[in-house]
């Protein structure tokens, strides 16, 4: 049996631009793509923390070191400059791979510079 698990996550990145008439996709700073192990043209899920929108598109390379997160094409209607996003990818794993898998997590500051690469997601405590 295969299961679909979180492969990588850019946590709380900030939208730097929205280009409605660009040919589509989401441009992401190459440093962030590499840190999260997201490849060009890979499907990504985007969750907008500000407005609750959730949508899928694909990643393209943004200028390295720029902190760019550009939501493009029709998806630009689902985000605004300054919005906080979670960008995630998923992959299928068999049972043995699942036991060994750890997602690539990338935490950033307000300029989308990498501040932490945590080893996992901690157990959530009850209130």
Curated annotation (Swiss-Prot):
Coiled coil: none annotated. The modification Pyruvic acid (Ser) is found at residue 25. Heterooctamer of four alpha and four beta subunits. Binds 1 pyruvoyl group covalently per subunit. Pathway: Cofactor biosynthesis; (R)-pantothenate biosynthesis; beta-alanine from L-aspartate: step 1/1. The lineage of its organism: Bacteria, Pseudomonadati, Pseudomonadota, Betaproteobacteria, Neisseriales. GO terms for cellular component: cytosol. CDD domains: Asp_decarbox. This is Aspartate 1-decarboxylase. GO terms for molecular function: aspartate 1-decarboxylase activity. It is found in: Cytoplasm. Its EC number is 4.1.1.11. Is synthesized initially as an inactive proenzyme, which is activated by self-cleavage at a specific serine bond to produce a beta-subunit with a hydroxyl group at its C-terminus and an alpha-subunit with a pyruvoyl group at its N-terminus. Catalyzes the pyruvoyl-dependent decarboxylation of aspartate to produce beta-alanine. The active site is at residues 25, 58. Its main location: cytoplasm.
